[in-house]
Amino acid sequence: HVEDENDSELKSFSLKRNKESLIPMIKDALKKRNNKIRIMASPWSPPAWMKTTGEMNFGGKLKDEHRETWADYYCKFIEHYEEENIPLWGISVQNEPEAKQTWDSCLYTAEEERDFIKNYLGPSLEKHNLINKKVIIWDHNRDIMVKRARTVLSDPDAAKYVWGTGFHWYCGNHFE
C-alpha cells in the first residue's frame, strides 16, 4: 500500500497491513495444499489519492494522471507478494467495476478498462517482466459479461494481454 500522495514512484510501497493476517492465512493455505493453489489478486480500490473522489469508498474513478502509477502498483504488489513466496497466478483489473459501493470500490466503463489494459497495465506487466501473469477482465456479475467482454476483447491491442473474463454469480436465476 502507498498512502503518500507524492510517491508516484511507489518507493514507500508496503505490505504491512497484509502481513498482519492476510499473508499468514495465504501461507497456511499454500502449506496445506503443498503450494498447489492458484491465487488471483483483485483490487477493490486504488489509494484515495489516485481517485476522483479522494477516498477509497463510494466508487469514484481512477484519475487520468495516475493510470501509469496504478498499473505499476499492480506490478509492485505482485513482486512483493512473490518476495513473500506467494506466487500470484493472475490479477483482475478491478473487483466489480460498475458497482459504487459504501466500501472500497472504483468504477470503470468497458472502454476505460480496455484502454487501461492496453495503454498501461499490459505495458507495465511487460516492463516488469510479469507478462506471464493472467489478466482477468470484468470480475463482476454475469448479466452483462458478454457485452462487457466484447468491448475489451474486440480491440487486439487490449486483448493480447487478457487471459479471460471473471464473473460473479450474484444475479439472475441461479439454477439455469
Q: Could you say what each language-model-derived stretch is?
A:
Residues 68-90, 97-176:
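Active-site neighborhood of glycoside hydrolase catalytic domains
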Residues 1-89, 109, 115, 119-123:
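N-terminal catalytic cores of secreted or lumenal carbohydrate-active enzymes
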